[in-house]
């Protein structure tokens, strides 16, 4: 996971790196790159000094086994190589191809880096050959472990790509099948429905012609023997109709109305009892559901009100218990802070005496210089103006450091009285 400290190490943004913790400086991104590796890759010496002084691991590698020395040697950053060698980085570290930083510099034809690493290797071989053999064995062991880790990551990535590729293939095949089936269905349905509609239209035309011919013939035959309409009924003959005929006529009209209203249920061959029974059952179900709702609603409302009342009673009891605890522990309320809100920094790194001394005198920017020369607080108190001049410190910083040393010596010689301070 890439963080802002990775970007600060790449861009040599020193103010942000001074706030980083040991965990932040050793956190790897997707490629296994840490801020230490990025600072060595880009040749940012000041950023590399701050990172290593705040706990950055100079021997941590990426997924390909490259350490900060590998990147500095490959890109020709001699100043970073000299700092890492003096800081104690393993110059015999191996990558996944079992190549050391010296081999990486030789493959890129970085002659100065090759000479610097060769000189450091000869010095370590002459001074402590047992330590050199132990470092080489450890480097080989770490390289084999890193190779297995890299193979596992590659296998996982290949399986993931294969799954995504198979999903894409299945999606394209299904889409092609669906398009083919749709086109086939559309063509067949269009042909069938077109022929059917054409046949239906032809039959309707033929029937309409026949109906017209028959109606015309019937009208002609009927009109030949009919009387005019005005001659059929007269006002004088209206009262002469018998009452039985009128009652029959009225009854026939009512029957026609009943037939028209009951035509939905009275179907020939289906049965009117089935439909009417279903209608009756539907009404009964609706009435039963209404009754159930009518019985359920009040009980649910009473339950909710009771639950709300119980919740309020529980809250009041909890508040009373808290007040009793506060009264019993009277000292807890006297504290000016809340102990639960106090947050402790988990990743805080224990500062060295030299770092504490420089921080107290506002001289923390000179810490990388002393770390590079392996100077601790005791050695710094023994340094003179000439010693500081030999490590290439300028006049202004030398005067500040010397005055701070004098103040410390005076305080140690004449310590003051211990006095309690108020919070």
Swiss-Prot record:
Motif (PDZ-binding) on chain: 421-423
Origin: domain of life: Eukaryota
Chain positions covered by the region annotation Disordered: 158-181, 207-227, 303-335
Domain SAM: 357-409
Protein name: Ankyrin repeat and SAM domain-containing protein 4B
Compositionally skewed regions (Low complexity) per UniProt: 171-181
Tissue: Cochlea, kidney, lung, liver, pancreas, salivary gland and small intestine (at protein level). Expressed in kidney, small intestine, pancreas, liver and colon. Not detected in heart, spleen and brain.
Gene that encodes it: Anks4b
Region (Mediates localization to microvilli): 1-251
Organism expressing this protein natively: Mus musculus (Mouse)
Residues in coiled coil: 130-169, 301-335
InterPro entries: ANKS4B_SAM, Ankyrin_rpt, Ankyrin_rpt-contain_sf, SAM, SAM/pointed_sf
A Pfam family it matches: SAM_1
Gene Ontology cellular component annotations, sorted alphabetically: brush border; endoplasmic reticulum membrane; microvillus; plasma membrane
Known partners and oligomeric status: Part of the IMAC/intermicrovillar adhesion complex/intermicrovillar tip-link complex composed of ANKS4B, MYO7B, USH1C, CDHR2 and CDHR5. Interacts with USH1C; the interaction is direct and is required for ANKS4B localization to the tip of microvilli. Interacts with MYO7B; the interaction is direct. May interact with HSPA5.
Annotated region described as Mediates interaction with MYO7B, given as residue ranges: 253-352
Principal location class: other
Compartments where found: Cell projection, Microvillus
Reported function: As part of the intermicrovillar adhesion complex/IMAC plays a role in epithelial brush border differentiation, controlling microvilli organization and length. Plays a role in assembly of the complex. May play a role in cellular response to endoplasmic reticulum stress.
Biased composition range(s): Basic and acidic residues: 207-224
């Amino acid at each position: 996971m890439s963080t802002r400290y990775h970007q600060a190490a790449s861009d040599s943004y020193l103010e942000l790196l001074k706030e980083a913790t040991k965990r932040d400086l050793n956190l790897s991104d997707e490629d296994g790159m840490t801020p230490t590796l990025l600072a060595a890759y880009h040749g940012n010496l000041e950023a590399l000094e701050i990172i290593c002084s705040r706990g950055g691991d100079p021997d941590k590698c990426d997924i390909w086994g490259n350490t900060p020395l590998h990147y500095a040697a490959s890109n020709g950053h001699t100043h970073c190589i000299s700092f890492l060698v003096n800081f104690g980085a393993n110059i015999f570290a191996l990558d996944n191809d079992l190549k050391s930083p010296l081999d990486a510099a030789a493959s890129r034809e970085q002659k100065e880096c090759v000479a610097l690493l060769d000189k450091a290797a000869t010095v370590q071989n002459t001074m402590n050959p047992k330590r050199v053999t132990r470092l080489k064995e450890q480097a080989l062991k770490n390289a084999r472990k890193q190779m297995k880790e890299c193979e596992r990551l590659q296998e996982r990535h290949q399986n993931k790509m294969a799954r995504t590729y198979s999903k894409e293939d299945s999606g394209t095949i299904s889409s092609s099948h669906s398009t083919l089936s749709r086109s086939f269905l559309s063509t067949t349905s269009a042909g069938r429905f077109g022929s059917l509609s054409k046949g239906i239209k032809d039959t309707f035309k033929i029937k309409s012609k026949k109906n017209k011919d028959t109606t015309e013939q019937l009208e002609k035959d009927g009109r030949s023997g009919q009387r005019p309409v005005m001659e059929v009924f007269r006002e004088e003959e209206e009262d002469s109709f018998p009452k039985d005929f009128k009652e029959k006529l009225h009854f026939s009209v009512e029957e026609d109305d009943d037939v028209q209203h009951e035509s939905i249920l009275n179907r020939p061959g289906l049965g009117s009892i089935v439909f009417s029974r279903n209608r009756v059952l539907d009404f009964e179900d609706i009435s039963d559901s209404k009754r159930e709702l009518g019985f359920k609603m009040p009980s649910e409302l009473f339950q909710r009100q009771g639950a709300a009342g119980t919740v309020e009673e529980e809250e009041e009891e909890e508040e009373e218990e808290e007040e009793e605890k506060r009264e019993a522990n009277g000292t807890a309320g006297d504290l000016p802070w809340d102990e639960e809100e106090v947050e402790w920094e988990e990743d805080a790194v224990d500062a060295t005496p030299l770092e504490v001394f420089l921080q107290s005198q506002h001289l923390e920017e000179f810490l990388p210089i002393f770390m590079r020369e392996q100077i601790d607080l005791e050695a710094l108190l023994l340094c003179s103006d000439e010693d500081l001049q030999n490590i290439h410190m300028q006049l202004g910083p030398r005067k500040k450091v010397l005055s701070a040393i004098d103040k410390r010596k005076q305080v140690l010689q004449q310590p003051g009285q211990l006095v309690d301070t108020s919070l």
